[in-house]
Amino acid sequence: MSDNTTLPAPASNQGPTTPRKGPPKFKQRQTRQFKSKPPKKGVKGFGDDIPGMEGLGTDITVICPWEAFSHLELHELAQFGII
């Protein structure tokens, strides 16, 4: 046993050499973009056909939003954030 063999250096118990990663980072969600356009205000079929309102034109501003969107269902109003 007079061989002069060299033994490798003892392996270190430090684990992998890649840097340790922290917790996952979440991206901030951007505002939702609807594929369809939001509904337009105004009641369908509302205009000069009201007695006593002749001459005012069909550009009638509706004060109550429920009247402005009476042709829509509640889930449609909620989808676009109207209610």
Swiss-Prot record:
The C-terminal region is important in conferring inhibition. This is Retinal cone rhodopsin-sensitive cGMP 3',5'-cyclic phosphodiesterase subunit gamma. Its EC number is 3.1.4.35. The keyword Hydrolase applies. GO terms for cellular component: photoreceptor outer segment membrane. It is linked to Cone dystrophy, retinal 3A: A rare form of cone dystrophy associated with supernormal rod responses. The disorder is characterized by reduced visual acuity, photoaversion, night blindness, and abnormal color vision. At an early age, the retina shows subtle depigmentation at the macula and, later, more obvious areas of atrophy. Participates in processes of transmission and amplification of the visual signal. cGMP-PDEs are the effector molecules in G-protein-mediated phototransduction in vertebrate rods and cones. Residues 1-51 are annotated as: Disordered. Belongs to the rod/cone cGMP-PDE gamma subunit family. PANTHER family: RETINAL CONE RHODOPSIN-SENSITIVE CGMP 3',5'-CYCLIC PHOSPHODIESTERASE GAMMA-SUBUNIT-RELATED (PTHR12122), RETINAL CONE RHODOPSIN-SENSITIVE CGMP 3',5'-CYCLIC PHOSPHODIESTERASE SUBUNIT GAMMA (PTHR12122:SF5). Residues 1-17 have a biased composition (Polar residues). Keywords: cGMP, Hydrolase, Sensory transduction, Vision. Tetramer composed of two catalytic chains (alpha and beta), and two inhibitory chains (gamma). It is an enzyme of class 3 (hydrolase). It comes from Homo sapiens. Residues 22-43 have a biased composition (Basic residues). It holds the Pfam family PDE6_gamma. GO terms for biological process: positive regulation of epidermal growth factor receptor signaling pathway; positive regulation of G protein-coupled receptor signaling pathway; positive regulation of MAPK cascade; visual perception.
